[in-house]
Amino acid sequence: MSSVQTIEVHTAPAYEVTIGAGLLRDCGARLKAVLGGCRIAVAVDSNVAPLYLETVCASLRDAGFAVCSYVFPAGEAHKNFTTLSAILEFLAESQLTRTDCVAALGGGVTGDMAGFAAASYLRGIRYVQLPTTLLSAVDSSVGGKTAIDLAAGKNLAGAFLQPAAVLCDTDCLRSLPAAVFADGAAEAIKTGVLSGETLFSLFEDGTLTDAPAEVIARCIRYKAGVVERDEKEQGERRKLNLGHTVGHAIEKCSGYAIPHGHAVAAGLAVMARASERLGWAEPGVSARIAACLEKNGLPTGTDYPAEALAKAALADKKRSGDSITIVVPKAIGDCELKRIPVTELLPIIAAGRGE
């Protein structure tokens, strides 16, 4: 494998995802080729700013960009209108125009909010993703979904806006605490369940720490193909929500104290057990998924009762009227979209919890 990999995502417009070491130090020159001359506002949270903001801003300035930056409080609890409004006011005060750009430097929360700010400001300006976590690298930085949370639930206000570029600096993964790295492992394992044995067996045979760049590349290639076929999530792309209906409910029930990846892992395990117990999945698939999650430091269940989870899930964006679409794992590489009445969600979750 070469030291730097480039994957093209053929959406409208198309863009490139670049994966390799040292990309933040070189981000100015790489983005200059994509953006030309413009002003860049870097959005970053209070955890990531001390680690990488100075490096990124220096690289951008060296490439001739005018640069400003906004630091907001870290954490899912701040992924809300208050923070979004503050970012938008900063963009206006900094006099960004429609030819300028927002750079999302950080994890999934930063990418979601900075992207939504870019989609909203002046009815849409360009943005780039500079993911610093495994979760944002393998999943949320690609595909153009942007959002904030509402009191009723997660990611309920947002927009689709494809980034102009994504630079995944694998050096950033070295600074991640084990729990944060595991967060990203959950989304990678989810992708393995969706894509098939080739990718999933990689996670069964060894932990993701063995070859993170290759894991990122494989996950992005799979997701890019899905997004290209269904950019606005009308069909196949909904399968990427595997584990997320219950996962988002777990996050909400915890007041977002449980991080996204850990919640998705638990949601995936619950849905796999439910699918097998209800006769939808081949025997043994839920045990394989649970073992893989455990090997990568992730939970395989939740203490929240089925009633609380079902109630929280009814605010999920995948609900439509009196029905909700769930993603059912039938085998590794075979997942089905199943539209069910909302009244059936509780017994399905209960089956997945062994109740």
What are these regions (language model features)?
Residues 2-101:
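ATP/NTP phosphate-donor binding region
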Residues 2-4, 186-189, 280-355:
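C-terminal charged capping/lid subdomain of soluble metabolic enzymes
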Residues 74-75, 105-107, 242-243:
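Glycine-rich beta-strand-to-loop/alpha-helix junction loops that act as flexible
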Residues 88-105, 114-129:
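Non-catalytic interfacial helical region
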Residues 109-116, 137, 249:
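Short glycine/serine/threonine-rich phosphate/pyrophosphate-binding segments
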Residues 116-206:
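A glycine/threonine-rich phosphate-anchoring loop and its flanking beta-alpha core
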